[in-house]
Amino acid sequence: MQRLGPFSTLYGRVLAPLPGRAGGAASGGGGNSWGVLGSHVQPPGRAQFGVGSTSTSSGDANSVCPAPSTMSKAEEAKKLAGRAAVENHVRNNQVLGIGSGSTIVHAVQRIAERVKQENLNLICIPTSFQARQLILQHGLTLSDLDRHPEIDLAIDGADEVDADLNLIKGGGGCLTQEKIVAGNASRFIVIADFRKDSKNLGDQWHKGIPIEVIPMAYVPVSRTVTQKFGGVIELRMAVNKAGPVVTDNGNFILDWKFDRVHKWSEVNTAITMIPGVVDTGLFINMAERVYFGMQDGSVNMREKPF
């Protein structure tokens, strides 16, 4: 792991993340539990894996809220990671994939600053409604995969990163479009704060692996996943509307709270082959490099092992 020194620049004010689209597309939450005989079923909101972790990351509904100082350090760490990635990888005349979530806000702000300062010619491809609005609000050039199917660089956040740079993504409900953009990029760079760095998936992130499904298939998909791999499935429910979260693609999100370490490449392939599954929040062997903003103001960089 390479440690980058702290930035000395005094950063300006950062825009807060945009709310999810109407209907709760980016909202998280609990939901209906679909356990089956022989599966390991626990109440919604309870950590399914990594019990005993002292992480302050969100995920366990019964955990004590972290102190404000911890949260401010996490937000500053996101800013550090986002700016480091932009400084090291964004160049003139690139087509950029812009991720979704709270961390990407800081990267987009720095991209906009560099465009103004250096007169960069950049084209931005969004991964969600939120990303599209960020691009427009910061005066960047918006495009899509129809016009620019080849992306030079994609930058996005993650809910958790393991030792092999496998990711869990989709806490904000944008996993399918995020995976499409990352998969069409020559380079995929991830930015995150110190809370997202884990040895194994599930050590820090306790909300499970998101699975986007066609609405009519959410019950059979839930049963099939738990029968094959154990754990418990929850249909993600919206916060500001009655009913489930609806993605930007008009689908539902299942959160699979697994109860043990798996061979994630095999699991990802098996789940995506289930009829009704659109995609999963497992990003396997996709990230080239991850920047972690740390509590001490430094940035740790990890590259994909070979």
From Swiss-Prot:
<dbReference type="GO" id="GO:0006014">
    <property type="term" value="P:D-ribose metabolic process"/>
</dbReference>
<dbReference type="InterPro" id="IPR037171">
    <property type="entry name" value="NagB/RpiA_transferase-like"/>
</dbReference>
<dbReference type="GO" id="GO:0009052">
    <property type="term" value="P:pentose-phosphate shunt, non-oxidative branch"/>
</dbReference>
<comment type="similarity">
    <text>Belongs to the ribose 5-phosphate isomerase family.</text>
</comment>
<dbReference type="GO" id="GO:0004751">
    <property type="term" value="F:ribose-5-phosphate isomerase activity"/>
</dbReference>
<feature type="region of interest" description="Disordered">
    <location>
        <begin position="45"/>
        <end position="68"/>
    </location>
</feature>
<protein>
    <recommendedName>
        <fullName>Ribose-5-phosphate isomerase</fullName>
        <ecNumber>5.3.1.6</ecNumber>
    </recommendedName>
</protein>
<dbReference type="InterPro" id="IPR004788">
    <property type="entry name" value="Ribose5P_isomerase_type_A"/>
</dbReference>
<feature type="compositionally biased region" description="Polar residues">
    <location>
        <begin position="51"/>
        <end position="61"/>
    </location>
</feature>
<feature type="modified residue" description="Phosphoserine">
    <location>
        <position position="102"/>
    </location>
</feature>
<dbReference type="GO" id="GO:0005737">
    <property type="term" value="C:cytoplasm"/>
</dbReference>
<keyword id="KW-0413">Isomerase</keyword>
<dbReference type="InterPro" id="IPR020672">
    <property type="entry name" value="Ribose5P_isomerase_typA_subgr"/>
</dbReference>
<dbReference type="Pfam" id="PF06026">
    <property type="entry name" value="Rib_5-P_isom_A"/>
</dbReference>
<keyword id="KW-0597">Phosphoprotein</keyword>
<comment type="pathway">
    <text>Carbohydrate degradation; pentose phosphate pathway; D-ribose 5-phosphate from D-ribulose 5-phosphate (non-oxidative stage): step 1/1.</text>
</comment>
